[in-house]
Design a protein with these regions (language model features):
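Positively charged n-region of N-terminal signal peptides that target proteins for export
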Residues: 1-4
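Short, solvent-exposed aromatic-acidic interface loops
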Residues: 168-171
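Residue-level detector of functional hotspots within protein domains
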Residues: 6, 41-46, 141, 150
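C-terminal motif of bacterial Sec signal peptides marking the signal peptidase cleavage site
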Residues: 15-19
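Cross-family signature of deubiquitinases and ubiquitin-like deconjugating cysteine proteases
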Residues: 8-11
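N-terminal export/targeting and maturation segments
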Residues: 20-85
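Functional cores of ribonucleases/endoribonucleases
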Residues: 77-163
Length: 171
């Protein structure tokens, strides 16, 4: 009896340990394979109702980065930097008052923020960006800020440091 109890306990412990080796997978909407990269940071701030932010930071070796960058050039929704204005407002906000395209002046805080309330991604000068509006299943940020809820995935790839920053916002 003791032996079977110990065997069951050992089996339970083995299953529990295997479950702890969770793999981190990026959102499918990115449309790219980042499996050669190394997860530097990942956190999920989604609450019980599914609202919140999730963040991934993936680093690539120079060799793997070249292959990854090549895939970004043809992947749907990916663009060479700089960001378009709608995406820039969502990711970084404005620096004080800015003149918008229609001539009005606006001041916007970033929508996709880190745990400290600041922009989730660092500013990147050279690389690629991605945006997918999960509500409309489109690759444009136009109109997202006017909605009462935002559900989108965004990413910025830094070609100089070979790091992919990805975030998901669900409100």
């Amino acid at each position: 009896m003791k032996r079977s109890m110990l065997l069951c306990l050992a089996l339970l412990l083995a299953l529990w340990s295997a479950a702890c080796g969770e793999t981190v997978s990026l959102p499918e909407s990115l449309g790219v394979n980042a499996s050669q990269g190394t997860v530097q940071d990942h956190w999920d701030g989604h609450g019980a109702m599914g609202d919140g932010t999730e963040y991934w930071e993936i680093a690539f070796s120079p060799e793997d980065a070249a292959e990854f960058e090549e895939s970004l050039q043809t992947a749907q929704g990916w663009h060479a930097l700089p960001l378009d204005n709608d995406v820039r407002y969502l990711l970084y906000g404005t620096e004080g008052m800015e003149e918008a395209q229609d001539g009005a002046y606006i001041s916007v805080n970033p929508y996709l923020t880190g745990k400290d309330g600041g922009p989730l991604f660092p500013k990147v000068e050279e690389g690629y960006w991605f945006f997918c509006d999960e509500q409309t299943e489109s690759y444009t940020a136009q109109g997202v800020m006017e909605r009462p809820s935002q559900n989108f995935t965004a990413a910025v790839y830094d070609s100089q440091s070979h790091i992919l920053y990805c975030g998901e916002l669900d409100t």
